[in-house]
Amino acid sequence: MGIKSIIIDQKQVEAGCNAALKWCNEHFAGKQVIVLGILKGCIPFLGKLISQFTFDLQLDFVAVASYHGGSRQQEAPKIVLDMSHDPKGKDILLIEDIVDSGRSIKLVLDLLHTRKAKSVILVSFIEKLKPREADIKVDYSCFKNQDEFLVGFGLDYQGFYRNLPYVGVFDPEDN
């Protein structure tokens, strides 16, 4: 299957999601928030959180494309599905599966800034620790990783493996 090792098992996934949930509920207590998921990878993470958020929210999505079948970004990211709610004057909770180079997130952050969002908080399931191409701040991450190619729990290779209930190190040469 190409998975060399499991680095975040199902119990760790649950614990990470629960910790993120607690952090978000404390941070956004008493606020009305637009929860903005970045498709497609956010689905498992956001799915674990959404029904247990204790603050008032509107749910929205944005999709950014920059990978085309490979394991590395191949072109400048672009918005391929825009959000439907107006972020002007609103608090935004941005949910992402992984922050890697930062280029895709920077595009979304710039869009929200241009549209005059009141505040933007970025919560990522995994944050890569390698130097980023874009200068962005992750406000909360469940897990940190150096620079391994990961699949599972929303992370994919050519559209596959997002459904795995764990996160594994992937070797595309062994697929």
Curated annotation (Swiss-Prot):
Organism's domain of life? Bacteria
**Where does this protein chiefly localize?**
cytoplasm
What is its cofactor? Mg(2+)
Location in the cell reads: Cytoplasm
Q: Which Pfam families match?
A: Pribosyltran (PF00156)
| Residues annotated to bind diphosphate | K40, G41, R162
Q: What EC class is this?
A: transferase
Q: Which InterPro entries match?
A: HGPRT (IPR050408), Hxn_phspho_trans (IPR005904), PRibTrfase_dom (IPR000836), PRTase-like (IPR029057)
Residue numbers binding GMP: K128, F149, L150, D156
GO annotation, cellular component aspect: cytosol
Q: Which GO terms describe its biological process?
A: GMP salvage; guanine salvage; hypoxanthine metabolic process; IMP salvage; purine ribonucleoside salvage
Would the keyword Isomerase turn up in this protein's UniProt record? no
Q: Which family does it belong to?
A: Belongs to the purine/pyrimidine phosphoribosyltransferase family.
Descriptive protein name: Hypoxanthine-guanine phosphoribosyltransferase
Q: Source species, please?
A: Mycoplasma pneumoniae (strain ATCC 29342 / M129 / Subtype 1)
What lineage, starting at the top, does this entry show? Answer: Bacteria, Bacillati, Mycoplasmatota, Mycoplasmoidales, Mycoplasmoidaceae
